[in-house]
């Protein structure tokens, strides 16, 4: 009888630990909520506008000049197939939303030589900045708690974060998030 009771306690302990682990994992996967996020205001977006990056040719990129616009920031790399897959859609959206004061910025977490060679084969019509490791640091500051790419952040004209997106964008999700950013 005593062995049976001990066995039940061990089973209960294992069940409790399993439930605790599941709750912890699920809470980490919650959807971004603008209303309660500490990663939303100008103090956070200032990190983007103040960042110092260059383009693939080594010329400084003036991100501060984008203040007052709706900015779609996509963190990517040349070695990331999902990143490369969504680039034509971003080029099309840059053209479609240009007159609505929307600017797309791709920040490559890569080396300048790799980005330069990539862009010669796969040109885009939006701003590309080369960030290397500091690109990952900026993406973390903008809410990328998974340190994953592609990762996209939208900042509205009032410098508030309106959406964060992990993984590849669908056209439908991109348009929905742009509509929200332009309100």
Each PLM stretch: what is its role?
Residues 1-50, 54, 163, 179, ...:
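N-terminal targeting signals for export/organelle localization
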Residues 54, 64, 105-107, 166:
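Surface-exposed loop and edge beta-strand positions of immunoglobulin-like domains
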Residues 62-81:
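Short active-site neighborhood of thiol/selenol oxidoreductases, capturing the structured segment around
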Residues 66-69, 99, 125:
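Active-site acidic short loop of glycosyltransferases
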Residues 75-76, 107-110, 131-132, 168:
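Active-site-proximal beta-strand/loop segments in catalytic clefts of secreted hydrolases
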Residues 84-123, 133-139:
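Structural microenvironment flanking redox-active thiols in thiol-disulfide oxidoreductases
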Residues 120-124, 131-179:
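Thiol/disulfide oxidoreductase modules built on the thioredoxin-like
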């Amino acid at each position: 009888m005593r062995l049976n009771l001990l066995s039940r306690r061990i089973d209960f302990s294992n069940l409790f630990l399993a439930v605790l682990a599941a709750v912890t994992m699920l809470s980490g996967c919650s959807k971004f909520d603008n209303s309660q996020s500490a990663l939303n205001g100008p103090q956070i977006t200032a990190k983007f506008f103040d960042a110092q990056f260059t383009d693939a040719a080594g010329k400084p990129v003036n991100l501060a000049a984008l203040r007052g616009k709706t900015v779609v920031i996509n963190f990517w790399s040349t070695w990331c197939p999902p990143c490369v897959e969504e680039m034509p859609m971003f080029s099309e959206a840059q053209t479609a939303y240009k007159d609505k004061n929307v600017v797309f910025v791709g920040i490559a977490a890569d080396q300048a030589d790799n980005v330069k060679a990539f862009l010669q084969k796969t040109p885009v019509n939006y701003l590309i900045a080369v960030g290397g490791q500091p690109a990952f640091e900026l993406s973390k500051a903008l809410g990328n708690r998974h340190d994953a790419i592609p990762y996209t952040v939208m900042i509205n004209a009032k410098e508030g974060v309106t959406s964060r997106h992990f993984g590849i964008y669908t056209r439908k999700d991109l348009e929905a998030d742009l509509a929200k950013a332009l309100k």
